Amino acid sequence: TLQRSAQTAQGVLTMKIEQVKVILTSPNQNYLFVKLITDSGVYGVGDASLNGQEHTVADFITSFLTPILIGRDPTQIEDFWQLVYRGAYWRGGNIVMSALCGVDMALWDILGKVTGQPLYRLLGGKVRDKVLCYSHVLGKTNEEKAALAASYVKERGLKVIRLRAGAPAANGTLGGGVQDGPKVE
């Protein structure tokens, strides 16, 4: 199993990060994912998207973070986080933090896989039994789109629709009418 392949006879993790892949998707709405691959074949994936700045975040990961990550123990998550956060020239800036968050997610993904534990347990335990799921209407929303979304959501047992309604006084938008629109529940 993954757990056994990542452990020595003493039960100590001995993996090293061997490869960093930056995956930029979709020409219209870019999402940026980071994939860290260890020498034992275990990999983790994280989301480093920053709307409109994905190429810059990707360059930061490739140029700055990859040399730091290669050869590192992926279970030393806090050590890596502190090194990057304290060592980055623009500490706390959007580019650095998006890149750092994506790598952080990937490292936690690896730790969850090698320990066989769900992330919620590794991060301190379960907080709730359920999570509210919702549907999203892309682009400018009109009454027809809202009605279709309401039907879609109702069929699937969801209770919330996220949409771009516009200002109440704007022509051609749902504006204030959204509050008076179809109820999904």
Regions found by a protein language model. Name each.
Residues K130-E185:
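Metal-dependent enolase-superfamily TIM-barrel catalytic cores that perform enediolate-based chemistry
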Residues V12-L50:
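Structured beta-strand/loop patches that form or line metal/cofactor-binding pockets in enzymes
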Residues D104-K140, E144:
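Glycine-rich, aromatic-flanked loop segments that form ligand/cofactor-binding clefts
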Residues T1-T14:
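Short, Lys/Arg-enriched N-terminal segments with co-localized hydrophobic residues
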